[in-house]
A protein has these predicted regions:
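Conserved functional hotspot residues or short segments at active or partner-binding sites
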Residues: 25
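EAL-family c-di-GMP phosphodiesterase catalytic domain
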Residues: 5-20, 32-141
Length: 141
């Protein structure tokens, strides 16, 4: 696999604990060709500042939002805002925790083009990655 085919996920906790060191490491990873995503976006100490200043390629919408968005209009509004904001910043968006077709359809209508969850596949052990169809690998972040 090429570095560009892999995503490195960084959590906000890592950023808070060691912001300068983490930033330097993210720059090095991106320079090496890896894609970097901010994981669990919307939870913890989410800050729009991270989106503006970090060398990242995208964000991952936390499953706590996608799991309840269809039943909670406020969460749905928050989820819908993330792809719009990301598009303005030229960032990709991955929605986590997609278990049902109606969730995926709603996310697609909101502008989310990548997703993870049991709707697509259960977690796969590293030794079985080579057995996945090639079409799944680019969106596996």
């Amino acid at each position: 696999m090429l570095p560009r085919q892999l995503c490195i996920e960084v959590t906000e906790t890592a950023l808070i604990d060691h912001p300068q060191r983490t930033r330097e490491e993210l720059v090095a990873l991106r320079d090496a060709g890896f894609r970097v995503l901010l994981d669990d976006f919307g939870t913890g100490y989410s800050s729009l500042n991270w989106l503006a200043e970090l060398p990242i390629d995208g964000v991952k919408i936390d499953r706590s939002f996608t799991a309840t968005m269809l039943e909670d209009p406020r969460r749905q509004a928050l989820v819908a805002a993330i792809p719009r904001l990301a598009a303005e910043l030229d960032l990709e968006v991955v929605a986590e925790g997609i278990e049902r077709t109606d969730q995926w359809q709603a996310l697609r209508q909101m502008g989310c083009r990548l997703g993870q969850g049991e709707l697509f596949s259960r977690s796969v052990p590293a030794e079985q990655l080579g057995q996945l169809p090639a079409v799944l690998l680019p969106a596996a972040c």
